[in-house]
Amino acid sequence: MTESDSDTVPTAGPIQDGPHQRLARMAGDWEGLYRLWFERDMLASESGQRGTLRAVLGGRFLLHEYTWEFDGRSYAGVALYGYHIDERRWECAWADSFHSGSSIMFSHTSGDADPAHFAVLGSYGDGQTPPGPRWGWRTEIEQADADHINITMTNISPDGEETRAVEVEYTRVRPVAGAA
C-alpha cells in the first residue's frame, strides 16, 4: 500500500460519509491568526500561525501539525482528530511545545456526539506539588466554508468558570498557479 492509498477516504464503508468526510474536507495547508489569553479579556499575544491538516490511516483521522510564535519564540504543536464510530464521539490527542509541556492531552466528547460539531473536553493538572484539582480544556473546530477554519480552546477552572484561552482563524493556502 502506498502512502497516498493509506491517506485517502474510502468510497465505501462506515467512514465514507458523515464525520470522517467532515474531517477530510479540512485537509490542506492553512495560515492565519493565532490569539492567546492567560486572563479573562486580556489578550496576551497575537501572531501568525501556519498549519497542515492531512488525512491519515485511510481517512480515519486528521493529523494537524502547526507552528506559531509568542514573545519572540517559535512553538509547534500536533493534534490527531478523529471520530470514534462505535462510541459515537469525537476524540483528540494534542501536544504543544508551549501549552502541554511533556504531556499529551487526551480529549473526547461525553455521551453521543453531534457528528456535525467537533467539540472535545480534556483536562490537565495545575502543575503544583501535591497536585491540586484538574482544570478542563475544551477544543472546538468549526469550518464555515471550504477555505476557513476556526479553532477555539477554552480553559475551564475547577469551579467551572470558562475563559477563552486560544483562538485560531485559518484561511486555506491555495497553490500558486504555475508553481512547481
Language model features by range: what are they?
Residues 1-180:
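Hydrophobic small-molecule pocket/channel-lining residues, especially in calycin-type beta-barrels
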